Amino acid sequence: MQRNLVVLLFLGMVALSSCGLREKHFQKLVKYAVPEGTLRTIIQTAVHKLGKTQFGCPAYQGYCDDHCQDIKKEEGFCHGFKCKCGIPMGF
């Protein structure tokens, strides 16, 4: 039962991430909803990794360029699932 609740909670957090909620909100939710232990640590690590991932990078060709132009006024390059501003793929 607890495993089902954790999976449902995790899927709900993934669904809500498209609404503009930040990683710290999810970390706080995990802190209060999941008992302390190894499972909480694993979920917090997964939330942190998903929070750093930019899913638009491989799906949309100009995502990184638009992202980097807004932030640093540099050309953007997609490195896996992350955008790197001003760092071409050769590095």
Curated annotation (Swiss-Prot):
Expressed by the venom gland. It holds the Pfam family Scorpion_toxin_alpha-beta. GO terms for molecular function: potassium channel regulator activity; toxin activity. It is found in: Secreted. Disulfide bonds join 57-78, 64-83, 68-85. PROSITE patterns: BSPN_CSAB. Residues 20-27 form a propeptide. Residues 54-91 form the BetaSPN-type CS-alpha/beta domain. GO terms for cellular component: extracellular region. Keywords: Disulfide bond, Ion channel impairing toxin, Neurotoxin, Potassium channel impairing toxin, Secreted, Signal, Toxin. The keyword Signal applies. InterPro entries: Long_scorpion_toxin_alpha/beta. Inhibits voltage-gated potassium channel. Belongs to the long chain scorpion toxin family. Class 1 subfamily. This is Potassium channel toxin BmTXK-beta-2. It comes from Olivierus martensii.
